[in-house]
């Protein structure tokens, strides 16, 4: 059986510092550009908009009747009743509902786009158990028609993740769901990167079937631990180099490795973990693994058995991104209950999220949350709309590390807003108007705001 690479990294990198002699002019300080592909997104509309007479779900646990939302310069300026303000645009939303823009924390749009043909399958780099060096943003095709379909369902922000074949699948990217010709034109400015990890059946099946480690769950854990040991050594070598240079010495920089740049980003608290993990005991092990190497376990995705460890997730500050009713399709996805989301949500300081992992259900993520609310309320819970909306707005933003920017209709936050024709938790509801940073990006009643990707031109 193939073994994981031996831990010689620290010796090799440490040797690079042997040149820390104060002789000759000091070399330039080698710095790693942590954002070589920056966002080029910019707010497209600075006009002011007043939405009046709506039922407003703020995303912070409030439900306001006959309320107004005032947007100025792409930000939420005020939310309340009978606002006395003047605006460039006024919309009477009598009988309609207003919520924050919907956020999906688990999508593969652009990396597994439509049409689903082999040449477009760019989400899983199944060449090694550890491909932390790959960035899914380099696979994202902005012309995927799925982005427009998702926007029609109120999706304003989404995280694109690599697939779950590998122990470390690579970096995810958070996007603004706006029409653009490049990925960078959609990239959410300054949003933290994510690192996709995967527990359980997928990595051991993909590599074990070829008699390559990991072949078992214990092989999975060994692979994670070895990678974090090497990442810790890489981090130490660069910190020693930085300290030596700051002290006026003349060290040689360690050799750069983009795989370990990503893992170091996690250790430094700059990259957030997003962990494909179904079973309770495996989520618990991943929390312990994070403690062993002093990083945060982040968000657990799918989490079929999250209800079994809801207290542990809350105590660790981990979000759980869950499906309402998708389970039983493989053994590790067997032991779920329909109350999963609600049980996680019921614990103090919890972070329950409803996600899609689907190009279909992302179009109706409000209905996915609605399924949970209506089902559990028939079984003794008392979930209200103002609480359930958090699963696809504020809590989702928290999972992505952008809760200070979006996810609620709070003063000063980005004006990512959806006007619904009726209660968004009704199966009959439709997103009528969608705003991103205060700019109208979709209007069900105006074709000018119904974007069509270049790929779809002439096809409908």
Please place each PLM-identified region on the residue numbering:
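Divalent metal-coordination and catalytic microenvironments
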Residues: 54, 69, 74, 95, ...
């Amino acid at each position: 059986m193939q073994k994981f690479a031996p831990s010689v990294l620290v010796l090799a990198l440490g040797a690079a510092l042997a040149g820390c002699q104060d002789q000759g002019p000091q070399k330039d300080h080698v710095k790693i550009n942590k954002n070589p592909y920056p966002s080029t997104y910019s707010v497209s509309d600075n006009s002011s908009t007043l939405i009046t007479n709506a039922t407003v779900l703020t995303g912070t646990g409030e439900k306001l009747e006959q309320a107004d939302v005032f947007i100025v310069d792409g930000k939420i300026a005020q939310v309340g009743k009978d606002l006395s303000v003047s605006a460039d645009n006024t919309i009477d939303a009598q009988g309609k509902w207003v919520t924050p823009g919907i956020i999906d924390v688990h999508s593969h749009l652009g990396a597994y786009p439509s049409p689903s043909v082999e040449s477009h399958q760019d989400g899983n780099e199944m060449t090694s158990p550890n491909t932390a060096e790959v960035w899914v943003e380099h696979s994202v095709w902005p012309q995927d028609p799925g982005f427009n379909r998702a926007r029609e369902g109120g999706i304003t922000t989404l995280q694109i993740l690599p697939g779950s074949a590998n122990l470390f699948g690579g970096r995810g990217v958070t996007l603004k769901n706006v029409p653009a010709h490049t990925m960078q034109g959609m990239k959410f400015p300054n949003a933290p990167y994510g690192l996709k990890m995967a527990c359980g059946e997928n990595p051991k099946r993909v590599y074990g079937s070829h008699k390559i480690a990991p072949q078992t769950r214990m092989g999975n854990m060994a692979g994670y631990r070895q990678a974090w040991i090497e990442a810790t050594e890489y981090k130490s070598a660069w910190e020693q180099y930085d300290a030596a240079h700051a002290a006026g010495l003349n060290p040689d920089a360690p050799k750069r490795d983009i795989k370990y740049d990503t893992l170091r980003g996690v250790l430094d608290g700059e990259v957030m973990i997003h962990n494909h993990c179904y079973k309770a005991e495996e989520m618990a092990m991943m929390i312990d693994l994070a403690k062993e190497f002093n990083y945060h376990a982040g968000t657990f995705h799918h989490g079929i058995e999250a209800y079994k460890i809801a207290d542990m997730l809350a105590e660790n500050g981990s979000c759980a991104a869950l499906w309402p009713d998708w389970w039983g399709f493989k053994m590790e996805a067997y032991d779920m209950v329909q109350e999963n989301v609600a049980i996680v949500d019921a614990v103090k300081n919890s972070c329950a999220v409803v996600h899609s992992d689907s190009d279909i259900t992302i179009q109706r993520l409000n209905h996915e949350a609605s399924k949970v609310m209506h089902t559990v309320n028939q079984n003794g819970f008392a979930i209200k709309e103002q609480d359930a909306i958090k699963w696809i707005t504020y809590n989702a933003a928290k999972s992505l590390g952008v809760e200070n920017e979006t996810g609620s209709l709070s003063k000063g936050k980005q004006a990512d807003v959806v006007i619904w024709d009726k209660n968004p938790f009704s199966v009959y509801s439709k997103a009528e108007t969608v705003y991103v940073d205060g700019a109208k990006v979709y209007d069900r009643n105006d074709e000018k705001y119904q974007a069509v990707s270049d790929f779809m031109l002439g096809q409908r």
